[in-house]
Swiss-Prot record:
Name of encoding gene: tpiA
Alphabetized GO MF terms: triose-phosphate isomerase activity
Biological process per Gene Ontology, one example term: glycolytic process
Record-listed substrate binding positions: 11-13, 181, 220, 241-242
EC number: 5.3.1.1
Organism annotation: Shewanella sediminis (strain HAW-EB3)
Major enzyme class: isomerase
Cellular compartment(s): Cytoplasm
Descriptive protein name: Triosephosphate isomerase
Complex formation: Homodimer.
Residues making up the signal peptide according to the UniProt record: none
Homology family: Belongs to the triosephosphate isomerase family.
Amino acid sequence: MALRRPMVAGNWKMNGSAQLALELFNKFATKLQDDSAEVVLCPPSIYLESVRQQLDANKDALNGCLVRMGAQNLSQHDFGAYTGEVSGQMLKDSGCRYVIIGHSERRRMYGETSDIVAEKFAAAQKHGLTPILCVGESGPAREARRTFEVIAEELDVVIEKNGTMAFDNAIIAYEPLWAVGTGKSATPEQAQEVHAFIRKRLSEVSPYIGENIRILYGGSVTPSNAADLFAQPDVDGGLIGGVSLNSTEFLSLCSIAMSA
């Protein structure tokens, strides 16, 4: 069985501040104990520099703890007249290691199709970034028992455009749309069922990828339900939304992941 290091990725969405970055690192420096889990902060692009400054300032205090920086989105284009967009190279220059791709809010609010998501996935890897690919079903799709069908379609488009081995440098986040920002989380059993399906799906085309890829759960993860979620055999941590804005609760999730 592969030893997959747990990850807790905080997606601030359009929230946060330079002060939040300071608060988080003040607690990381004294509370994070080891490198048994990886912590990723994904602030709005305007605060990437604030997070980077805190990473540099606390390098010694973190003492080898794995705290990384990620972005919430990127353009599928390398450069050009795309007002308001940020390229993969720009994110790499800013110190990012990860980037969230295909979040349900991007798909729903900004019309990002699976084809666009696949292009962004490729753009991230082209510039040395590890994509955190989000997949998940809506409430009606779950009620219609189409969960596996929807997720398979979202995965297959990325595989068709980028090849299976592209997932050798990628993270997957399962985020059921009916749980994102609603306060209603999937049960540990529901999460495990879908994570196991994703792993099996990838194993069919590459046993190595299926065994080794990290699959995060995203959807109203809190300190009260994280231990049961993270204890599932195919759940390798969480993509955290609202709780990532509370330094105390986010640190609690990091500690839970480290002991999972």
